[in-house]
Amino acid sequence: MDEHRSRTPSIDSRNYAIPEADYLPAGIDIDRNGVSESDDSSDDDAQSSLFPTESSGTLWMNQIQDTPMFDSSKFLFESVNNAINDIDFSESLAIQAKTSALINSKSRELKGLIKQLQEKVDYYNERFKRGAVVSSQLKVNLQMLSKRIATLDDLFSKQFPIEYNQSKEKVMERTLND
């Protein structure tokens, strides 16, 4: 039951390549350097009709046929195999995963800190507004009390001048001693 599978592709694309002999008539052979005549000699007009000039755009087909066939399935298999087995590839994936996790973690941490900061800003903003209202009320109360004290001071200084001056002197002595 232990089967060992081949690591080579199951289909060889070279099996399906059309041989060069099928392209040409029987009287002409192709070698790597170009066109040569076989035993059956033909005139130059016949050769020129089979192989058009460069300006006709078909010369490139002859040049392509001279190059070896490209095995795309082998190339694809080797590319995938190298990519999967390559240690650098797995290390880069691991580093990328760690970096992504770190960025995600820091992003969540920053979002939490921003939320806490916003809550504190809202809290202190509300306290400042209440403090502004309280301070304006205190200012009004202090102004009203200073007017009452000034009124009482005038009233006591006129109705009880002797007692008023004695108490004023005691207060002055107390502040000088301290």
Curated annotation (Swiss-Prot):
Biased composition (Acidic residues): 37-46
Entry's Gene Ontology cellular component terms: BLOC-1 complex; endosome
PANTHER family: BIOGENESIS OF LYSOSOME-RELATED ORGANELLES COMPLEX 1 SUBUNIT KXD1
Stretch list, region Disordered: 28-53
Keyword line: Coiled coil, Endosome, Transport
Domain of life: Eukaryota
Cell compartments where the protein resides: Endosome
Gene Ontology biological process: endosome organization; regulation of protein localization
Protein family membership: Belongs to the KXD1 family.
Subunit field text: Component of the biogenesis of lysosome-related organelles complex-1 (BLOC-1).
Function noted in UniProt: Component of the biogenesis of lysosome-related organelles complex-1 (BLOC-1) involved in endosomal cargo sorting.
Protein name per Swiss-Prot or TrEMBL: Biogenesis of lysosome-related organelles complex 1 subunit KXD1
Phylogenetic lineage: Eukaryota, Fungi, Dikarya, Ascomycota, Saccharomycotina
Coiled coil (UniProt feature): 101-130
